[in-house]
Amino acid sequence: CNSSPKSLERVQEITGKTLKFYETDIRDEEALEKIFTENSIDAVIHFAAFKAVGESVAQPMKYFRNNLHSFENLVELMVTRGKGANIVFSSSATVYGQPALDELPIVEEQPFQEASSPYARTKQVAEGILEDCVKAYPNLNATVLRYFNPIGAHPSAHIGELPDGVPNNLVPFIT
């Protein structure tokens, strides 16, 4: 698990709502099926991925298993249930590779370049999976968010970046 149960408590405090939480690995197809069966899910906001570029270079298989296998399970379950399926996918600007200065600023239509890390490759592959599945399954709708460096937190500071160990980006150092 690369999140904190404390975050769930904080979201409940902020919203005043009780949230249902399942602690599971979405690579576990049976557990994922159970969650969808027990709930009337018609939309998913998918943020479940490892995101440390350096770690992905050192441990690429960890990233492929977590970021891609879990994503495939989720999308397959969404499209085979026969209901309307909507997904918001958290991608990354790393899909653009390392553009040359004359290719800046980056625009959304800019083609992908060679992935600069296994993390970036997982995002490129996942976007490709979504693109193909949206074409093949009329019940699937997808929105992809390509962050450059997501920053910020709730004004209460109860939710936001909570890195384990040394942070991988600037914001935790300055907040």
Feature map (PLM): residue ranges:
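N-terminal Rossmann-like NAD(P)+-binding domain of SDR-like oxidoreductases, especially those catalyzing
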Residues: C1-P155
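Substrate-positioning beta->alpha
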Residues: R121, V144, I159-T175
